[in-house]
Amino acid sequence: MNLHEYQGKQLFAEYGLPVSEGYAAETPQAAVEAADRIGGTEWVVKCQVHAGGRGKAGGVKLVKNKDEIKAFAQKWLGQNLVTYQTDEAGQPVSKILVESCTDIAQELYLGAVVDRASRRVVFMASTEGGVEIETVAEETPEKILKAEIDPLVGAQPYQAREIAFKLGLKGVQIKQFTQIFMGLAKLFEEKDIALIEVNPLVIKDDGNLHCLDAKVAMDSNAAYRQPKLQEMHDPSQEDAREAQAAKWELNYVALDGNIGCMVNGAGLAMGTMDIVNLHGGSPANFLDVGGGATKERVAEAFKIILSDSNVAAVLVNIFGGIVRCDMIAEGIIGAVKEVGVTIPVVVRLEGTNAELGRDVLANSGLDIIAASSLTDAAKQVVKAAGGAA
């Protein structure tokens, strides 16, 4: 679950990290009032969306008077911001962050993520601040400094000092960096965070370190332990179908094709998309209904898939390991009747009672195509959707 920048900075402030004074505004007038509270003659206004690249898209601006603040808010509030990280529709802007202006002498990068390879939280830092860390990793990987956090003892000050020295920090900056490092580590653990990025972490003209940006993502699996962070959830930033799927514990990701895919198991779902592509088709989604594929969940999955107007055919690929294929077949039939599916549906069943499941589908009287194998299913659904792309 992603947080907005202003929410991330609220967390940073709770843990004693240096952030700019700023306020989120929902109206142009509130944005002007926020500038009055902050004071000064220059401010930075930022569109609050769950996407990077806001600056290049015009969603971040340095303003020098209240009229500019009002004009910026009027331009963006209620509109969608399109960046290189969003789709063509962009993300809706419902809040503007107004904060004090910060002088920048140098930009650094500091972040932390759960590294699956080492099975530990890994801190990363670089002198290449303000740049996507993926770009740095690809082009100049030697510029990324890392520190693995031992889960037994937690983050240690010496790890922060080692990185600070390598970043070229001196004197009081080393102490400040250590405080920021330890604060982020504490925040990461206590709030069940999956990703933190401070990009950029800046050295101001006076030599002090300052967190100029905040990207925070919480581990959604731990949301039940973090009720305060759950309150920060902004569903408007998510695909409506993905949000609906999450309510039914369905793993759904929208794609650009015209063949809807409903599968039980993430690995099988990816394999299904691959074989559809192999035979010239284009998947419209990734959808994993999981092990408990009940009639109700299958029906909801159909509704979500069919809410995409591009879908011309649906491929249901079920391996009956935990569940029986005949029960799944009955669920599919019930779902097709309930939802009123009018496009071709191809079903491939394998595993426990697979033959019985295919018989149930064949005798249903519905226009459901029972495939004999995964290859056959892929070929049939591609044909039903209009042929190879």
Curated annotation (Swiss-Prot):
Under which pathway is this protein filed?
A: Carbohydrate metabolism; tricarboxylic acid cycle; succinate from succinyl-CoA (ligase route): step 1/1
**What does the entry list as the binding residues for ATP?**
46, 53-55, 99, 102, 107
UniProt-recorded Gene Ontology molecular function terms: ATP binding; magnesium ion binding; succinate-CoA ligase (ADP-forming) activity; succinate-CoA ligase (GDP-forming) activity
Domain ATP-grasp: where? 9-244
CC annotations in GO: cytosol; succinate-CoA ligase complex
* Protein keywords: ATP-binding, Ligase, Magnesium, Metal-binding, Nucleotide-binding, Tricarboxylic acid cycle
Q: Name one Pfam family in it.
A: Ligase_CoA
UniProt-listed Enzyme Commission number(s): 6.2.1.5
User: According to its UniProt record, which reaction does this protein catalyse?
Assistant: succinate + ATP + CoA = succinyl-CoA + ADP + phosphate; GTP + succinate + CoA = succinyl-CoA + GDP + phosphate
Co-factor remark: Binds 1 Mg(2+) ion per subunit.
Indicate which residues the UniProt annotation says bind substrate.
264, 321-323
Q: Which cofactor does it need?
A: Mg(2+)
Q: Which family does it belong to?
A: Belongs to the succinate/malate CoA ligase beta subunit family.
Please identify the protein, giving its name as recorded.
Succinate--CoA ligase [ADP-forming] subunit beta
Organism name: Pseudoalteromonas atlantica (strain T6c / ATCC BAA-1087)
Q: What is the lineage of its organism?
A: Bacteria, Pseudomonadati, Pseudomonadota, Gammaproteobacteria, Alteromonadales
